[in-house]
Regions:
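Bacterial N-terminal signal peptides
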Residues: 1-9
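Scaffold/interface architecture of coatomer-like assemblies
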Residues: 11-306
Length: 306
């Protein structure tokens, strides 16, 4: 298993070194009883268990101290085409606010296929410009497909849009935090992979999922069974990867961006050497607790040892 060790010397920036040992990395955030993010914890304030067995923390740090690798995953299927377009300036402002000098992000758009519209860039302005071009609907077939090509005429490949970038866009040499922000209603009808595979891919590659959900009601403004299922899917994906599920239709994209930015700036990362054998192909449950009562920890629920 690849793990990331953070080394720092007095006043110097931290450096990430990836080594082949049985270490597990976990990004997590903590909230108090009022829902406010807690950003002042130390290694001595938290405990971690794997499958109920206490683990020794070998690394603890603030996520803001390491580079951010961010993926923007945009649903451009028929029901979602009007979702992000009016908020491109808000998206650009969010990226400018959340991305520091060493941070970088990529852009993927998906409907029946998953396509890389912009590879990693340190400029939020460039990413939004690429999205504007993709929104025009011209030349989309020229964007490279992420993952194996699938023959699909119509449909929405929501699960593939998480599974493929989680596996392919965050390589072993990628330093720092890993996150995907998914803009969608969570509905899927043409993926080659299923929901559990998408969650497993994110957990295995230390990717946190932030879901900005926009649900277009059915006829007469009623919420359909498909709407409800998509809502539950996005909530589960965010919960099991330690991220955030946000109803952007009800509360607005600006507020969603604010909450995601706050969590990214206030989260932590820890590492421990697992007592379980590497590559046993079983699911190992992770639990992080704070010694202070009344705090809620959001982290991935576990991982499959590969």
């Amino acid at each position: 298993m690849l793990a990331c060790l953070m080394l720092a010397g007095g006043g110097q920036a931290q450096t990430a070194i990836r080594v082949e040992v049985s270490l597990v990395n976990v990004a997590f955030s903590v909230r108090d009883a009022r829902g406010n993010l807690v950003a002042s914890l130390t290694r001595d304030d938290v405990e971690v268990t794997e499958d109920g067995v206490p683990q020794k923390i070998t690394f603890f740090g603030r996520s803001a101290d390491v580079p951010l690798n961010l993926g923007l995953i945009m649903d451009v299927s028929g029901s979602q085409q009007s979702f992000v377009k009016p908020h491109l300036k808000d998206l650009e402002a969010f990226l400018k606010n959340v991305m520091a000098s060493e941070d970088r992000a990529f852009l993927i758009c998906f409907a029946n296929r998953v396509r890389l519209v912009s590879d990693y860039s340190g400029s939020g302005k460039e990413l939004v410009a690429a999205l504007r071009e993709a929104e025009k609907g011209k030349g989309n077939a020229e964007y490279p497909i992420v993952g194996p090509p699938e023959y699909r005429i119509l449909g929405t490949a929501f699960y593939d849009a998480i599974y493929e970038p989680a596996n392919l866009m965050f390589t072993g040499s990628t330093r720092g935090r890993r996150a995907l922000i998914v803009f969608s209603d969570g509905e899927d009808n043409s993926s080659a992979h299923h929901m559990l595979e998408a969650i497993e891919a994110a957990q295995a590659n230390d990717v946190t999922l932030f879901c900005l959900r926009y649900t277009e009601p059915g006829r007469n403004g009623r919420v359909t069974a498909r709407n409800k299922y998509g809502t539950s899917v996005m909530a589960r994906i965010a919960r099991e990867t330690g991220g955030l599920d946000f109803d952007a239709q009800a509360h607005g994209l600006q507020e969603g961006f604010r909450q995601i930015g706050a969590q990214l700036r206030s989260s932590y990362e820890l590492g421990y050497q697992t007592s379980n054998p590497s590559g046993d192909k079983t699911f190992h449950k992770i639990a992080i607790r704070t010694k202070q009562p009344g705090f809620e920890v959001r982290a991935k629920t576990g991982y499959y040892s590969r």
